[in-house]
Structures are given as C-alpha cells and as structure tokens.
C-alpha cells in the first residue's frame, strides 16, 4: 500500500493487442494518450448525450490515470480493462466501453454496423482502410454486406 493509502498497481509493459483498437478510437487526436477532450469528443458521438457529464469524464480520467499526469496512456487503459470484469464472458475488459464504441460507430442507430458505418468511422478516426479490408472485417464479424455487423460481431473484429 502507498503512503497515501492507495494500493500500488504495477503497470505491465506487455500490451494486450485486443485493447489497442478501442484505445485508438477513444484517443480522438491520436497523440497516444486519452485526455478529457478526447473523452468529450468520443462521447459527443453517442446520441444519448448523457455520457458527456464533466464529473463523469473527470472521474474516468482519475480512476485510470495511475501516474497522475492528467492523461490515460495505453498501459493505464489496458490495466483498467484487464482488472474490470467483462460482464458477458469474464475475459477481462469493459463491455460498457465497447457498447459505447459501438453506439458511436452506428451512425444511423439501427443496432448494426453497415459497410458505410464502418468505412465512415474508420475514415473519421484517421485509420486508412481499403474497401476490401472493410468487407473482410464484416466477414470476420459474421455479418454480410446487407445486414452489417452486430455488437457481438464488433467484439470479434476487436478480438474480444
């Protein structure tokens, strides 16, 4: 235990590649760390509007920010997700976070990610992908070009 009464959690340097895509989506300015501005921008894409509360954003940063620099680096992000029980499978991760990612990507709110949804989001996130790569993602997720990808399919794409 630290003198402050907090428990020290060692941060590993072995990155879990399953969390990298989620981190890159939330890191909207692509500077390698998640800031309060990144979270505001991320949650602005979710139709409910309730998730951009400043107190909640501050809490999210402070919970994950192990080195107290005001940002969440990938290793800190990874540590939070690895220690949070995955409500569906127990594999480690945050189902709620992934649902938020899904909502941001689902532009028309129909509960499925279409080819257009995936292409649009990848472009807006600065991730250069070809049409064939988008089609491969849809196939990997168990979807097709007509029906798109479900939430569970998105988890397959991210390797969760």
Swiss-Prot record:
<feature type="binding site">
    <location>
        <position position="38"/>
    </location>
    <ligand>
        <name>Ca(2+) 1</name>
    </ligand>
</feature>
<feature type="binding site">
    <location>
        <position position="112"/>
    </location>
    <ligand>
        <name>Ca(2+) 3</name>
    </ligand>
</feature>
<feature type="binding site">
    <location>
        <position position="65"/>
    </location>
    <ligand>
        <name>Ca(2+) 2</name>
    </ligand>
</feature>
<protein>
    <recommendedName>
        <fullName>Calcium-binding protein CP1</fullName>
    </recommendedName>
</protein>
<keyword id="KW-0479">Metal-binding</keyword>
<feature type="binding site">
    <location>
        <position position="67"/>
    </location>
    <ligand>
        <name>Ca(2+) 2</name>
    </ligand>
</feature>
<feature type="binding site">
    <location>
        <position position="31"/>
    </location>
    <ligand>
        <name>Ca(2+) 1</name>
    </ligand>
</feature>
<comment type="function">
    <text>Binds calcium in vitro.</text>
</comment>
<feature type="domain" description="EF-hand 3">
    <location>
        <begin position="93"/>
        <end position="128"/>
    </location>
</feature>
<feature type="binding site">
    <location>
        <position position="110"/>
    </location>
    <ligand>
        <name>Ca(2+) 3</name>
    </ligand>
</feature>
<feature type="binding site">
    <location>
        <position position="69"/>
    </location>
    <ligand>
        <name>Ca(2+) 2</name>
    </ligand>
</feature>
<feature type="binding site">
    <location>
        <position position="106"/>
    </location>
    <ligand>
        <name>Ca(2+) 3</name>
    </ligand>
</feature>
<feature type="binding site">
    <location>
        <position position="76"/>
    </location>
    <ligand>
        <name>Ca(2+) 2</name>
    </ligand>
</feature>
<feature type="binding site">
    <location>
        <position position="33"/>
    </location>
    <ligand>
        <name>Ca(2+) 1</name>
    </ligand>
</feature>
<feature type="binding site">
    <location>
        <position position="29"/>
    </location>
    <ligand>
        <name>Ca(2+) 1</name>
    </ligand>
</feature>
<dbReference type="Pfam" id="PF13499">
    <property type="entry name" value="EF-hand_7"/>
</dbReference>
<dbReference type="InterPro" id="IPR050145">
    <property type="entry name" value="Centrin_CML-like"/>
</dbReference>
<dbReference type="InterPro" id="IPR011992">
    <property type="entry name" value="EF-hand-dom_pair"/>
</dbReference>
<dbReference type="InterPro" id="IPR018247">
    <property type="entry name" value="EF_Hand_1_Ca_BS"/>
</dbReference>
<feature type="binding site">
    <location>
        <position position="117"/>
    </location>
    <ligand>
        <name>Ca(2+) 3</name>
    </ligand>
</feature>
<feature type="domain" description="EF-hand 2">
    <location>
        <begin position="52"/>
        <end position="87"/>
    </location>
</feature>
<keyword id="KW-0963">Cytoplasm</keyword>
<feature type="binding site">
    <location>
        <position position="108"/>
    </location>
    <ligand>
        <name>Ca(2+) 3</name>
    </ligand>
</feature>
<keyword id="KW-0106">Calcium</keyword>
<dbReference type="InterPro" id="IPR002048">
    <property type="entry name" value="EF_hand_dom"/>
</dbReference>
<feature type="binding site">
    <location>
        <position position="27"/>
    </location>
    <ligand>
        <name>Ca(2+) 1</name>
    </ligand>
</feature>
<dbReference type="GO" id="GO:0005509">
    <property type="term" value="F:calcium ion binding"/>
</dbReference>
<keyword id="KW-0677">Repeat</keyword>
<dbReference type="GO" id="GO:0005829">
    <property type="term" value="C:cytosol"/>
</dbReference>
<feature type="domain" description="EF-hand 1">
    <location>
        <begin position="22"/>
        <end position="49"/>
    </location>
</feature>
<dbReference type="GO" id="GO:0009536">
    <property type="term" value="C:plastid"/>
</dbReference>
<dbReference type="GO" id="GO:0042538">
    <property type="term" value="P:hyperosmotic salinity response"/>
</dbReference>
